[in-house]
Amino acid sequence: MTNLAPIILFVYNRPKHTETVLNALKKNTLAKDSILYVFSDAAKKEKDFENVNQVRDIINKISGFKEVVVTQAETNLGCANSVISGITKVINKHGKAIIVEDDILTAPNFLEFMNEVLNKYEKDEYIFSISGYNVPMQVPESWKSPVFLTYRYSSWGWGTWKDRWNEADWDVLGWQEIFTDKTKNKLFRRGGDDLPYIFRAQMNGTMNSWAIRWYYNNYSKNRFTVFPTYSLVENIGFDGSGIHCGKAGKAPNKPVITQNGEKIDLPDALEFDEEMNKLFISRYKYTFKDKLRRFLKELLRYKINK
């Protein structure tokens, strides 16, 4: 395969996770032909110094890729700023990118899938990004495509193109309308009932997320993300070690799919399928109790951070 997208890996203070993620990436069939960019954020607190240095020891000895470019921040940028600036730098040079963070375990055919889809649908402007992750769901026997469209985004092993990325408004102007206009709130929730709560936390300053702002841009332009029918990644960060992922026994995860060598038969044109979308979004539907619990959680977080 030619015209491969570069891989971007963001790391911070988790040496064991970083090593595990790199080992999985190296087992990808296209790793040896791919350029890997690694962005290492500097320690925010003194207690993080040792782990950050251990991570940097690991990333400065990486092999198994066509080329490795390591960037080590001298001061702490924070997760959101690190990701936004890193992707912008690489994607403006290469035109597209595949992005992985230090808790995303990839299947051996992850890079093959991502490159195939990025190349296939680059000209389809209604597609905003590509995901390598999918939730556990009972796929109908009638569904034969390896991919489907949904309104939700994913930051668990994903890719996009320069033109889509550079359209993003990171200041999310007009965001208040999500909470004052019922129609817009309903449209925003097409990606999941959890998203308005995450978005409110971001805009209240109790969360610092690039991903929810990326979704806002996806929503505002009425675009889709391409998801694989079966997941090609597993998030190993639900152990309390991450910035945004705490401990969770019911993380929407799925074991990594390891089959390899099968040709990915992508349709020439993608159409939104309501049934597949309903199956997918059902993982993010809230009951009244869920909504009340989430509201109280965000209220408590807001009071603590005031």
Where in this protein do the model-derived segments appear?
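An acidic/histidine-cluster motif and surrounding catalytic segment
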Residues: 1-99, 104-306
